[in-house]
């Protein structure tokens, strides 16, 4: 089932986010189950929204590619929401 993952990253800056995306971006684009990624600044830091084919695909990618590169003090708060619908072009 397609899931939406929202990552709230307190204390993250645009520079920190851009650096992380530079590290994991190619792997993300090729990851099994990956559908889309978007991000924006919030008052407390940064928010990332992703769509994945399954929660398992998302958590495996996070564990293998994101978590090993997180700087000290940066720990995203993840929430998962199964989607009722997804409309693609």
Q: What function would you assign to each model-found segment?
A:
Residues 1-49, 53-67, 74-89:
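Short S/T/G/P-rich N-terminal loop/turn motif that feeds into the first structured element of a domain
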């Amino acid at each position: 089932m397609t899931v939406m993952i929202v990552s709230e990253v307190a204390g993250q800056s645009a520079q920190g986010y851009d650096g992380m995306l530079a590290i994991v971006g190619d792997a993300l684009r090729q990851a099994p189950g990956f559908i889309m990624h978007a991000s924006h600044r919030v008052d407390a830091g940064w928010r990332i929204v992703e769509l994945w084919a399954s929660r398992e695909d998302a958590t495996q990618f996070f564990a293998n590619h994101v978590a090993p590169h997180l700087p000290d003090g940066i720990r995203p708060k993840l929430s998962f929401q199964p989607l009722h619908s997804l409309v693609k072009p």
